[in-house]
Amino acid sequence: MKQEQNRIIRDTKSDLLFVQGAAGSGKTSAVLQRIAYLLYRFRNGLDEKQMMIFSPNRLFNHYIANVLPELGEKNMIQTTFQDFIAKRLGKLEVESLFEQFENETNEARKEILLLKESTFLFELIGKYIALLQKGGLRFKDIKFRGETVISKEDIQAIFYATPRYKMPARFLETKKVLREKLYELANLEAKKAWVKDEMELLSEEEYRALVPTKLEFQSFDDEQDYLAKKIVRLKFKKLHKSVLDNQFWHMKQQFGHFMQYAPRLFDLAEFNISKEDWENEIHRIVASLNENKLALEDAVLFLELCDAALGKKVNRIMRFVFIDEIQDYSKAQIAYLKSIFPSSQFTLLGDLNQAIFKRNEKSLLEEIAPLFDASRTSVVELSKSYRSTEQITNFTKEIMTESERIIPFSRQGDVPKVIQTENFVAMMDVVQREALKLKKSSNMVAIIGRNQEICEEAYLSLYKKMDVKLVHMGNQKLSEGIMILPSYLAKGLEFDSVIVLDASEKTYPSSADKTLLYTMCSRAMHDLVAVSNGEITPLFKTIPNHLYEFETLSVKTQLPSDS
């Protein structure tokens, strides 16, 4: 373990350091020590602002923020992939972690999502941009006081009249011409009646703000002319800014057109996608864009399209990028980050057994390896799990079919408990009983549910009976005591005790749920309890009986009425 951790901590040469580790194997600890080591090793030429870590959620960010000062280091730049993308999107809203997880069950879109998560469409954007050099760019009218002052047709004519430079240069030239036109239009606008009306309504204070104290006019007309132009130019400032910000280009419409045009550049059938499903996907994207929203898998494509047209704003100062829970990233997302940070060395951490968003069974390392120089790629595997007791690790590894390489740490404890109940009320009675019992010996007891809905139901059932906190997207803070949180907010974290909420057949029906269930169970350090409403999940039934304690409660509890 020491040797492997040293490889992680002290590697300064690899462009890609890929750390595959079992849950609780010390990945995060090693990487935090790596950060401290790098800051010390390059102390004369590296500061914390040249290092960035992508965490699975904001809860994990709080954890890192507390740990780094303990290592004697200042905090580096911390973000989540969603927050990073949202910042680059500006006014467009990217789907939250909650929405991303809750929408995961749509099987009809599986093949389309696999396509988007590859780099195929990402790379196709280059071909599409080349076609746009000849025509097809979507523009918007530039309006002032509700009237069009430069039409989209005029903008299109200006753009395609520019020399055949690369697309970003043509946009720069177009902006230059548009701003010149705005200056001309401002002079014409200054002669209109509304300007005279505004001048007459100016207060003394407003007048002084427009006219410098030392300025003297030769005549009343000179003064009026000056004021008129000043008023209009101030009003036109917004138009100039909108041009500088490329708001005359209809980016949302352009992205919709790209998705519509894309099947002309490849065969949908090769990706097992029907024309009908693709059309439905376009309708979904357009509907989202009309609400100023984008799904995460679309956001990367949208940004790449904008970057290809306008020029990519890269960060060449960033030296080291760390990505935790890499198993939940797509190849397209990694490719985008690599293009944004071209001078960075990447450290990727993950456990392929914990992929809760990924749909592709292909090895992640195999997928992303072509993005990096093979001669400057290092892979470190950590197979020993130190987080949980031997009993919990032996139980959780049996959930996965290919977990032979997970080696438990020889810390002893109780075997996990699996309790089957008949209904929701009975289940919540057991959850309350177990949580209060565990709290006596645990600082943090986490009741983890599959999604936000089951967590909210559990909270409503418990909050009047015991002290419990609900952790959700709007309140991502950890505290001691008993908390309820959805699976996707538990990523990367550990708790003294874990209660898996509703580990039933209806909630986790098939092998497709094994990575999610494994992730939830492997958060526990000392105690693990799983409670089901109805028949337990078949994923537990394949675990040897001696590895857990099974209990069936057949208490006849009256269910609440719907009224």
Task: Label each region the model flagged.
Residues 24-26:
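Conserved glycine(s) of the Walker
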